[in-house]
Amino acid sequence: MAYLNATVSKPVISLLSLSKKVLKFEHCGGEGQCLGLITEFVIHPAAMGTLCVSIRLLMILSAITAAKSRFIDKPRLIVNLTDGFGQHRFFGPQEPHTVLFHSLNSSDVYVGGNNTIYLFDFAHSSNASTALINITSTHNTHRLSSTCENFITLLHNQTDGLLACGTNSQKPSCWLINNLTTQFLGPKLGLAPFSPSSGNLVLFDQNDTYSTINLYKSLSGSHKFRRIAGQVELYTSDTAMHRPQFVQATAVHKNESYDDKIYFFFQENSHSDFKQFPHTVPRVGQVCSSDQGGESSLSVYKWTTFLKARLACVDYDTGRIYNELQDIFIWQAPENSWEETLIYGLFLSPWNFSAVCVFTVKDIDHVFKTSKLKNYHHKLPTPRPGQCMKNHQHVPTETFQVADRYPEVADPVYQKNNAMFPIIQSKYIYTKLLVYRVEYGGVFWATIFYLTTIKGTIHIYVRYEDSNSTTALNILEINPFQKPAPIQNILLDNTNLKLYVNSEWEVSEVPLDLCSVYGNDCFSCFMSRDPLCTWYNNTCSFKQRVSVETGGPANRTLSEMCGDHYAPTVVKHQVSIPLLSNSYLSCPAVSNHADYFWTKDGFTEKRCHVKTHKNDCILLIANSTTATNGTHVCNMKEDSVTVKLLEVNVTLM
């Protein structure tokens, strides 16, 4: 054990009395992970406040230093959809609360708003593509009150039509939509909240429906995971989770149906004796789909297979912890390959650095089946807590009582392949995550990440599976809206490769085959790193429109794609300047990941480093003399490849 007496300006190691208070770093975001150096301190109570400040300052400096040194964070290029890419549709009135639905194999997009569902058909012109479905409250007696509106919060495709559910003046109800006509289905508790809010989940799995929405308005402070339809209705205990914020849920169907699981992802408040350390913990919870509730009267309507585990999104090189769960994207493996299902988690650190960590369902399943229970020091009962029962048997009361009192497993879920740091780390605050895995010839060889920022833009990251780099590269920023605004919802159509994204004002269709934005030469096409693009017929082309022989993943190196003469065409200018004058030469920054430098007669005149320059690389020619005469060359260096961009022949007047 280490002993520490801390001040704000300089932490000093000194020996204190063993009677002083013990601080474990689990209060900072994970046991032994705050600084990655010391697990436990004995702290004098008077030093507690200054110690917290010291630790926070050290961690902020560590995070900033690591973020600057390890990778280039900013997007390589920036594209505005108003430049002719994509399509836009406007709502008319402002819609502060929306839900987005896209019908597969069609160009239809539904947006649920206040008393209205908007239908946009992006295959037709904007003048003929909008339909309004009015679904006003059935209890609308006080029009001046927002609580008497009908905010649509759920759109779900069913065999008999589109299910739409809304707040309905605090009397949650649902409607069925067919061919723009609506049928009122009546009150449906658990499918819509009493008022619009985030963090409400509804999961449909075969004949069962799961929900985190409160069934009673008076229990607005209650947070439970429920099964509300299908098999017997069940809910989690009051003590199972501490003020959880639910993010995502999924069903995993295994080879033995009795062992099917429901996994839900959330963050919760952690118990801490030190209020200076606001502490949230990212979690995954599990229940068995076959759970029939308990045997006793106290457990008959409770989940008896609920367990929870911590998701460990950590950079072990720097000790940075990402403890706030923002979003989850689930990549579903093919049928009968459930263990290969991937969980992509978007996290924030306490200082608003973002990270994406990858977990596997196989690892999650292993942790729940093998880990001890946290703070439980006795032999586990048989069957062990969390185990699914065959033939719809009830979990024995003894097993339920242990799991109900000790629902957290001791082992965390680590990143895929025990990775030492997240696949993405960024200074940007990201809010939502989508993932597309690129497949050619039956092999996944690249992963594309779509991340939304708090400013309303989309960042696209790429990681090649066989790359020596373990992190993804930020290749593109997209501004999707005509009117800049935060992004409320985003959907991926991975069949037609479209993104659908909406704000409170508009919805946009973003094509993912943006190959033409990268330039009109092979070098620029290759340097984009976009796995969806290749050089074909003297054009940067969408790979799915090119044959495998010419556009497949074999064309990965610069020489393979572009040949030996890959350099772009050099732009040449001739300028004349007065003697003893000051002039500026500007070299365009065609990539935010490149270094630029001006040379003349083989000597470097000016360097613009990738981590410091923000715009064009400017060369100042001060007090021009005869030595100024000649050709000034702007060069670009990116990934060990150097090419000429610009030649300016300067003569004196």
UniProtKB/Swiss-Prot annotation:
The PSI domain, residue ranges: 514-563
Keyword Signal annotated: no
Keyword Ribonucleoprotein: no
GO MF terms, alphabetically ordered: chemorepellent activity; integrin binding; semaphorin receptor binding
Entry's transmembrane regions: none
GO cellular component terms given for this protein: plasma membrane
Domain of life: Viruses
Annotated GO biological process: integrin-mediated signaling pathway; positive regulation of cell migration; regulation of inflammatory response; semaphorin-plexin signaling pathway
Keywords (A to Z) from UniProt: Disulfide bond
SMART domains: Sema
Disulfide bonds: 587-634
SUPFAM superfamilies linked: Plexin repeat, Sema domain
PANTHER family: SEMAPHORIN (PTHR11036), SEMAPHORIN-7A (PTHR11036:SF80)
Protein name: Semaphorin-like protein A3
UniProt organism field: Alcelaphine herpesvirus 1 (strain C500)
Gene this protein is translated from: A3
